[in-house]
Regions:
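Glycine-rich phosphate/pyrophosphate-handling loop used in enzymes and phosphotransfer proteins
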Residues: 1-251
Length: 251
């Protein structure tokens, strides 16, 4: 922990990203945990949950929504199963914090968690960091203006740093695209078809495996839309990675 971080923690003691209780800061740690011990334990327990489709723990699960399969995505890596209407407040509050609080500690923590999944996936596919590029799905202009940041960009930036893989912005978000959470599955798919436009980065992603970052994946429409654009730009393959997925139904 650097001097500036230490001084900041002394003046503004860190609070748990989930329950908002003060966290005792350990100056010997290289990285601050954004969760208090109780919430961290709950988070780790959520990671041990089994996927209701394949029966594997979330860190081993590679299930993905049909939209992503149709778009030829290779896999979807996720940390937890997200149930927005469930009782798992530890996850719901944490996701809310990611979306609405621009906290570098939280993004770095998630990136370290994602790193473990990606290393395993890359080894299985014989991929080197030089074979890959990290990108993200841009947030809507309205939400970015409301909160002052884009959580997808922040997650991708932290993940690129811990993985030693370059991050490239591959999409722009159109102003006309609606907020996904208010749409049904069919409407989401139509909305996402016109939500993004490609950036002129073909030379940077051609023949690369693209690691596409998002916070929550529900129907996979956003990921699928991004993947199709990436393939059209010359990408070799697309791996999705997210904090959690709400996908529940069996294929």
């Amino acid at each position: 922990m650097g001097f500036i971080d230490l001084a900041t923690n002394l003046i503004f003691p860190p609070k748990c990203a989930n329950c908002k209780e003060l966290i005792s800061s350990d100056i010997t740690k290289k990285q601050i945990d954004p969760l208090c011990p109780t919430c961290r334990m709950n988070f780790e327990n959520e990671k041990q949950r089994e996927c209701n489709r394949c029966g594997l723990m979330m860190k081993f699960c590679r299930c993905m929504p049909k939209n992503m399969s149709r778009a030829q995505c290779s896999s979807l890596l996720k940390l937890v199963s997200y149930r927005p209407q469930g009782n798992d407040m530890a996850i719901r509050n944490f996701i809310y914090s990611v979306k609405h609080s621009n906290n570098k500690v939280t993004f770095d923590f998630i990136a370290e968690q994602m790193r473990e999944l990606l290393i395993s996936e890359m080894r299985g596919a014989s991929l080197l960091p030089s074979d890959c590029v990290i990108t993200f799905l841009p947030r809507s202009h309205q939400n970015k203006a409301n909160d002052g940041f884009d959580q997808g960009y922040e997650l991708a930036k932290s993940l690129a740093r811990v993985m030693g893989i370059p991050m490239v912005k591959c999409f722009n978000r159109k102003l006309i695209a609606q907020e996904q959470k208010n749409l049904n599955q069919y409407e989401r798919r139509l909305n996402m078809k016109s939500a993004y436009t490609p950036c002129e980065v073909e030379d940077e992603i051609k023949d690369k495996t693209i690691i596409l970052v998002d916070d929550i994946v529900t129907t996979g429409a956003s990921m699928a839309s991004g993947a199709r654009l990436l393939f059209a730009m010359g990408a070799f393959s697309v791996i999705g990675v997210c904090i959690g997925t709400t996908e529940k139904t069996k294929s």
